[in-house]
C-alpha cells in the first residue's frame, strides 16, 4: 500500500510538473495578443525568426515613462495631426537557428476599415526603438531583439518599441492587427490582434 501511495504521488507530481511547462505559447502565423500579462501570447513564425508581442498600448507624451519612448524624434515626426495619438507595440524577436537572419522591416498595423499604419522611425538615440536593433543588420544566431542587457530588454515592457501615429477613430475600429512581412519573401507573413 505504501508503494502504491508513493507511486501515485510520483505520477501526480509528474503531471503537475508537465502542466508547469511553457506550453502557453504556441508557434503560429496568426494569433491574438493576450493582454498585458503576455499569458498565452502567440509566437509568430515569420521565416526563420520568431516574433512575440509583449505589450501594445496608447502612449501619453506627458507621462514620464512614455516620454522616454518618444525620444529621438524630429520636430516633424513629433507633431501629431488632430485626431491622432501615439501607439506603441513592444515585441521580442528570437533567432533560434544557427545562422544569422534579417529581421522584418515591414511591420504595419491595420484596423477593420483597412486603415494601415507604418511605424515612425526614431533616431538611434531612442534606446527602445525596434529599428535601432533591426536596421543594424542580420540578427545573429541564437540572439534576440532587444539584445540582453540593453535599456529596452531591462525596461518595464522588456520589448523593442514599434512607434505609430494612429487615428483615434481606429481605436473604435478594432481589432487592430499587427502585420509582419518577411524581408526576403513577401509571401511569408504573420499577424496578431493587438490589445488596446
Which positions does each model-derived feature cover?
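Conserved functional micro-motifs across diverse proteins
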Residues: 20-196
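Bacterial N-terminal signal peptides that target proteins for export
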Residues: 1-7
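C-terminal motif of bacterial Sec signal peptides marking the signal peptidase cleavage site
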Residues: 15-19
Amino acid at each position: 500500500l505504501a508503494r502504491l501511495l508513493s507511486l501515485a504521488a510520483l505520477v501526480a507530481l509528474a503531471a503537475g510538473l508537465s502542466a508547469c511547462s511553457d506550453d502557453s505559447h504556441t508557434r503560429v502565423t496568426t494569433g491574438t495578443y493576450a493582454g498585458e500579462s503576455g499569458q498565452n501570447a502567440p509566437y509568430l513564425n515569420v521565416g526563420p525568426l520568431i516574433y512575440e508581442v509583449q505589450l501594445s498600448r496608447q502612449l501619453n507624451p506627458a507621462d514620464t515613462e512614455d516620454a522616454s519612448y518618444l525620444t529621438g524624434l524630429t520636430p516633424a515626426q513629433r507633431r501629431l495631426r488632430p485626431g491622432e495619438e501615439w501607439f506603441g507595440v513592444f515585441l521580442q524577436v528570437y533567432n533560434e537557428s544557427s545562422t544569422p537572419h534579417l529581421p522584418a522591416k515591414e511591420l504595419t498595423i491595420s484596423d477593420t476599415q483597412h486603415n494601415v499604419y507604418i511605424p515612425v522611425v526614431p533616431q538611434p538615440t531612442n534606446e527602445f526603438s525596434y529599428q535601432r536593433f533591426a536596421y543594424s543588420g542580420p540578427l545573429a544566431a541564437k540572439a534576440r531583439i532587444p539584445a540582453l542587457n540593453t535599456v529596452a530588454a531591462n525596461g518595464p515592457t522588456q520589448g523593442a518599441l514599434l512607434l505609430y501615429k494612429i487615428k483615434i477613430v481606429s481605436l473604435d475600429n478594432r481589432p487592430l492587427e499587427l502585420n509582419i512581412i518577411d524581408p526576403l519573401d513577401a509571401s511569408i507573413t504573420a499577424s496578431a490582434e493587438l490589445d488596446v
